[in-house]
Structure formats: C-alpha cells, structure tokens
C-alpha cells in the first residue's frame, strides 16, 4: 500500500494483541468485550490498559451485539451457552448503552464504528440472520439501539425515545424506564406525578 501511495494512511482491524498491531498507521480494535468475552464493564479496564501501554497507536474501535426484536424479556448481560438462539433485544440495548457510557469518558480513540446498521442473512446462524444490526433484516423496524445513536449522532433532528416498549410481559413491582433524548432532559410522569430521572450516559 505504501508503495502505491505513501500519502495515504494504512488501516487494519484487529482482535489480537501483540506486534501485529504495529504494522499499519491506524488500527481499529474489534475486541468484542462484553460480547464473546468478559462483560461490558471490562471495557473501562481495557481502555485504561490501552492508554497506559498502547497509547502510541492511533486507535479506533468497532463493536456490536446481537438482538432479536421478537425476543423480549431477560436482558441479562451474561451470555449463555445457547446465546445464538436467545438474543433478546434488551441485552443488545444495554450493551450499546454501556459502550456509550465508557466511550464518552475516553479521549484516546480517533473513531467509533458500529459493526453493522442492518441485520443480514447468514447461513452460520440458526435463524439464518446475523442480528447485530440496529435495524431488522426487512429494513422496516428500528431496534432501540438505533434510536440511541440517532440521539447521539444526529445533530439536525431531535430524538426522544422510550426503550423497551416491545416488552409486553414484565415481572416485579419496580420497573426502570429508559429514555434517549437529544431534546433536553425528559420529564417522566406516572399518574400525574413527576418522577426523578438520573443520567446514565450521554443522551440516556
């Protein structure tokens, strides 16, 4: 690449450690933290290690988590042995919320990428669909995580979105309401009473 045009920076995506990551001018990490290894909270630890030991690299990051809108209920972050069959939308939503929280505190990364905007067909998946997109395979239904990035990245159109509206069955008397807003602090009311809100991350 350098022989063809020395003026253009080279870039690569890596899920490995080691000297391999020193080859290109730019590196985009695809470590899948909180997806196929560890928990999303471990992203904060990894970013700290990146700053202390690899800060000479020009680093970006890409990430994603599967979520099927037909699967609602337990949004638990810990992955199960049958996770290819059980991919609740709520778990994908929380995954992206956590990444938003930790990446907002970081100044080292030069770029952020979501793995894919749309779900796509895959013979490797039991349902025949790779569901890491923010929009369904038919391009008609937007998942909650789509609205998160619209609130974060769309500066021309204000966003106000309540998550979890497809969760028809809920357990317990205490419920959490999550709102994405780029239109100012939302006001949440219940039976005429205004509820206290707490910011979890930018726009959340």
Q: What residue ranges belong to the model's regions?
A:
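Exposed aromatic-hydrophobic patches
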Residues: 204
């Amino acid at each position: 690449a350098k022989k063809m045009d020395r003026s253009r920076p080279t870039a690569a995506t890596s899920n490995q450690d080691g000297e391999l990551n020193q080859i290109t001018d730019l590196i985009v990490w695809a470590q899948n933290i909180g997806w196929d290894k560890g928990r999303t909270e471990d992203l904060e630890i990894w970013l700290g290690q990146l700053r202390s030991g690899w800060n000479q690299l020009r680093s970006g990051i890409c990430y994603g988590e599967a979520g099927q809108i037909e699967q609602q209920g337990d949004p638990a972050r810990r992955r199960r042995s049958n996770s290819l069959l059980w991919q609740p939308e709520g778990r994908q939503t929380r995954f992206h919320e956590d990444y938003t929280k930790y990446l907002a505190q970081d100044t080292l990364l030069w770029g952020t990428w979501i793995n894919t905007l749309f779900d796509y067909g895959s013979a490797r998946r039991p349902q025949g669909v790779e569901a890491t997109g923010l929009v369904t395979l038919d391009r008609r239904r937007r998942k909650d995580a789509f609205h998160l990035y619209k609130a974060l990245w769309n500066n021309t159109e204000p966003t106000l979105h309540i998550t979890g509206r497809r969760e028809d069955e809920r357990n317990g008397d205490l419920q959490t309401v999550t709102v994405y807003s780029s239109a100012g602090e939302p006001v949440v009311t219940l039976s005429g009473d205004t509820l206290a809100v707490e910011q979890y991350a930018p726009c959340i």
